[in-house]
């Protein structure tokens, strides 16, 4: 299907395409509508990577470069670490959740959170609950009253949940 200025121009299928599955999308900026718009390719590339982390086996080709993830959010965490973690990342998957957690050598907390395949850079209820659960679990396991911020210092984690009828604020 070809669109221009919001109108459908053609509705056709590609002939001579070797692949029997998948979708080809090409976006060309309409200068009359967008002027001298330029893509922020760093942003687009990160979005493409996120889609592959969240959809195992999905291959996305951006400007001739293929992106694929074989290990989901584990690949995201490994790709974002700048040094060796303190321990091998813990990778947990369930029917509607995927979590990866480790600790690095730095300060602060690094979270990558997603709801229904959408990146939630500001976190959300799922991330807040995860942060609390990590601190509570460690405190209960060791039977110590550690400060939660000490437990979470240098944490690197990714969480993806699937939620029926999510509310984004």
List each model region and its residues:
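GHKL-type ATPase core
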Residues: 1-82
């Amino acid at each position: 299907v070809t669109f221009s200025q919001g109108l459908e121009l053609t509705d056709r299928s590609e002939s001579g395409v070797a692949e029997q599955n998948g979708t080809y999308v090409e976006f060309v900026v309409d200068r009359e509508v967008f002027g001298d718009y330029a893509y922020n390719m760093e942003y687009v590339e990160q979005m493409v990577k996120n889609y592959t982390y969240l959809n195992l086996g999905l291959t996305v080709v951006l400007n001739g470069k293929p992106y694929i993830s074989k290990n989901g959010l584990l690949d995201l965490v490994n790709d974002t670490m700048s040094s060796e973690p303190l321990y091998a990342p813990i990778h947990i998957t369930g029917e509607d959740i995927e979590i990866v957690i480790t600790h690095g050598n730095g300060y602060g907390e690094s979270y990558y959170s997603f709801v229904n395949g959408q990146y939630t850079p500001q976190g959300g209820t799922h991330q807040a609950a995860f942060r609390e659960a990590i601190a509570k679990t460690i405190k209960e396991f060791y039977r110590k009253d550690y400060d939660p911020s000490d437990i979470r210092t240098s944490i690197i984690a990714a969480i993806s949940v699937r939620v029926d009828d999510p509310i984004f604020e």
